[in-house]
């Protein structure tokens, strides 16, 4: 009977993990769809810009042809301004002869001005695009240049205000956790088989706050409760005495500011997590550096030494 219970518990845990994987895959598919739509839109925009440029060029050429045709037919070009006023003793025939002459000499200049103006606009647009692209590349480079270590994690002290069973999953709790923000965060944890519900209430915990929010069986989870973990046992990490919600956990050997949100595509959490362990004194560490709340102490597991943390 005990064996059946253990198998059932493992199956429920595997089910919860499978749900997380499915939700993650759904998010990746949605991102790929958005990227494909964006690329198609950009291609269409580029095509339309090329067509617009061709149309503008054709319009200007037709304008010049119209001006020349009017000149040949003796139509005076009203918009052409003469550099010197006509003498009053000019005959009508002289005026007709002079007007085409002036218009003919002015039209190439007008064409060059229009062409120069369009070239200037194209150049300005190209420069603006170049500047924007450089800024985007610079921002991406600054993020990529940050070392992949525990300083990227937004680890904070939280207090579980309420905890209850997930309505659609027997192995999951749904908690409302105070992390020092204006409103509590909703957190879904697979701790039903390891921590009694009454021990979850008003409990101080360590939270990872910058994972991308993900739905777990229909409930959006906005953080993760950090635990010492092994295949047989799980213990919630305990903050040092005197900690309050919102206190930041730092690592002396790994200074730096945490990411606003860990990029799931870059697998930052997945690269850091294998180096999170409790030491022989049950203190939570990253590559030997303790989880520390400045001026208050370190975080630790109750009994689990030399265990992984997740």
From Swiss-Prot:
Its main location: nucleus. SUPFAM superfamilies: Nucleic acid-binding proteins (SSF50249). Pfam families: tRNA_bind (PF01588). InterPro entries: NA-bd_OB-fold (IPR012340), tRNA-bd_dom (IPR002547), Tyrosine-tRNA_ligase_regulator (IPR051270). Disruption phenotype: Increased Hsp90b1 surface expression, dendritic cell hyperactivation and development of lupus-like autoimmune phenotypes. Retarded growth after birth, reduced food intake, reduced plasma levels of glucose, free fatty acid, glucagon and insulin, increased glycogen content in the liver, and rapid decrease in blood glucose concentration upon fasting. Residues 92-110 have a biased composition (Polar residues). Residues 6-46 are annotated as: Required for fibroblast proliferation. Induction: By wounding. This is Aminoacyl tRNA synthase complex-interacting multifunctional protein 1. The gene is Aimp1.
């Amino acid at each position: 009977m005990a064996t059946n219970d253990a198998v059932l518990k493992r199956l429920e845990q595997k089910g919860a993990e499978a749900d997380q994987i499915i939700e993650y895959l759904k998010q990746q598919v949605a991102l790929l769809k958005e990227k494909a739509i964006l690329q198609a839109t950009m291609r269409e925009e580029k095509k339309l810009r090329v067509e617009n440029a061709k149309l503008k060029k054709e319009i200007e050429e037709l304008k010049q042809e119209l001006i020349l045709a009017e000149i040949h037919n003796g139509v005076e070009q009203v918009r052409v301004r003469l550099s010197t006023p006509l003498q009053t003793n000019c005959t009508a025939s002289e005026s007709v002869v002079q007007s085409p002459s002036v218009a003919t000499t002015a039209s190439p200049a007008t064409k060059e001005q229009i062409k120069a103006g369009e070239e200037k606009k194209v150049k300005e647009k190209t420069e603006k695009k170049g500047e924007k692209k450089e800024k985007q590349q610079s921002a991406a480079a600054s993020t990529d240049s940050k070392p992949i270590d525990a300083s990227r994690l937004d680890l904070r002290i939280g207090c579980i205000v309420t905890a209850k069973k997930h309505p659609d999953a027997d192995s999951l709790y749904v908690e409302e956790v105070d992390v020092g923000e204006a409103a509590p965060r909703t957190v879904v944890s697979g701790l039903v088989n390891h921590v009694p519900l009454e021990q979850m209430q008003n409990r101080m915990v360590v939270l990872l706050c910058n994972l991308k929010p993900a739905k777990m069986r229909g409930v959006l989870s906005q953080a993760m409760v950090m635990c010492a973990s092994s295949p047989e046992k799980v213990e919630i990490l305990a903050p040092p005495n005197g900690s309050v919600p919102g206190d930041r956990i730092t690592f002396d050997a790994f200074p730096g500011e945490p990411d606003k949100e860990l990029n799931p595509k870059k697998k930052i959490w997945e690269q850091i997590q294998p180096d999170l362990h409790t030491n022989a004194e049950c203190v939570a560490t990253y590559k030997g550096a303790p989880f520390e709340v400045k001026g208050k102490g370190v975080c630790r597991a109750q009994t689990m030494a030399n265990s992984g943390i997740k």
